[in-house]
Curated annotation (Swiss-Prot):
Gene3D superfamilies: Imidazole glycerol phosphate dehydratase, domain 1. CDD domains: IGPD. Pfam families: IGPD (PF00475). Keywords: Amino-acid biosynthesis, Cytoplasm, Histidine biosynthesis, Lyase. It comes from Marinomonas sp. (strain MWYL1). This is Imidazoleglycerol-phosphate dehydratase. The gene is hisB.
Amino acid sequence: MADRIASVERNTLETQIKVSINLDGTGKFNCVTGVPFLDHMLEQVARHGLIDLDIHAVGDLHIDAHHTVEDLGITLGQAFDIAVGDKKGIKRYGHAYVPLDEALSRVVIDFSGRPGLEMHVPFARASVGGFDVDLFSEFFHGFINHAKVTLHLDNLRGKNTHHQAETIFKAFGRALRMALEADERMAGQMPSTKGSL
């Protein structure tokens, strides 16, 4: 399998974002977005997905974090789409259950080429660490539309908003790792009966 790396820049009147990823990394993480709780969540993706992430974002945070969070999802999705390449030889599907104390979340992903998001996370509070939890949906919509994946996010139980969010992002990282692993029995083959994804 060729090197699965990508660097993408997005520059608008609202944000300037640069994302570099290595899908076959060790979980190295360097991230400055100006949104500390989001940085904390993205670190979970890197560590649990064994994906090297280097992210630098400057956004119009004097308004709120909406544009920064959404555009980061878009840019990260674009980077994944490039790094994954033609998808030959990958497992394609990934899933993970992750607990953290009272919270339990399940994430299932399909590198299907068809963007779709089902997010069912009944957050206990509207914000955590100064972060508006509504923005998680904006992040994941940006990601799925540009990574071209189908993503199901379910928080099955939880009372602590931080724990709910953290289990989602840890499970997201682990599901990515599973889906993107090389399948030795499918080496060089497309993981679809259609012959393309």
